[in-house]
């Protein structure tokens, strides 16, 4: 499998998931239909999104790590899949929820070769490969902000930081793409307990890095050794090369 195959598969999945979600009334999306492998309730919207995605991925020689079903398949290519990132938004009609896929030649993020995020509500498509990162087919880069008095997304605003604006959209994959295309200058998820799982963030991290961003753990360590595994959790500090060290110093 190469980048072209991954893009083809991702686009097919995005189309099918979007159709599945669009056909569901909001009152149906919100119903609990079981418990996911991650230990959280599965909404009807999650179930139909994952079913649509897995129907396509089962035709490929891949190992899939996904929120609801866990680890599936035994292929040489690993796929971190979140078929519906931003479930709450999807159940309320808030237009920030995405399908997210990251493809890797091993079970580690450092061997990823393709990332894909598709906003199911707006139709905006983000992907990255060896040539760079793209939004709706156009190259994107992170912002060139140099000062902390900047726009930021932060999940743990208990302390007073000198940011001009803070936003929380409820979809890490989409938010990392907002960082990647320069809409926001930073992305931080510094919640205690490392609430993000690998399938939440892998594609967004890959896209952000290919757009020129620096993305690390709280201690500045690379995310490259994070595994495509249900137990893998992470915090994220993402900014451009100039802002990143300032953010790390600030949140110590």
From Swiss-Prot:
InterPro entries: Inositol_monophosphatase-like (IPR000760), Inositol_monophosphatase_CS (IPR020550). Magnesium. Can also use manganese. The keyword Manganese applies. Its cofactor is Mg(2+); Mn(2+). Mg(2+) 3 binds at residues 38, 40, 67. Pfam families: Inositol_P. Phosphatase with broad specificity; it can dephosphorylate fructose 1,6-bisphosphate, both D and L isomers of inositol-1-phosphate (I-1-P), 2'-AMP, pNPP, inositol-2-phosphate, beta-glycerol phosphate, and alpha-D-glucose-1-phosphate. Cannot hydrolyze glucose-6-phosphate and fructose-6-phosphate. May be involved in the biosynthesis of a unique osmolyte, di-myo-inositol 1,1-phosphate. This is Fructose-1,6-bisphosphatase/inositol-1-monophosphatase. It comes from Archaeoglobus fulgidus (strain ATCC 49558 / DSM 4304 / JCM 9628 / NBRC 100126 / VC-16). The gene is suhB.
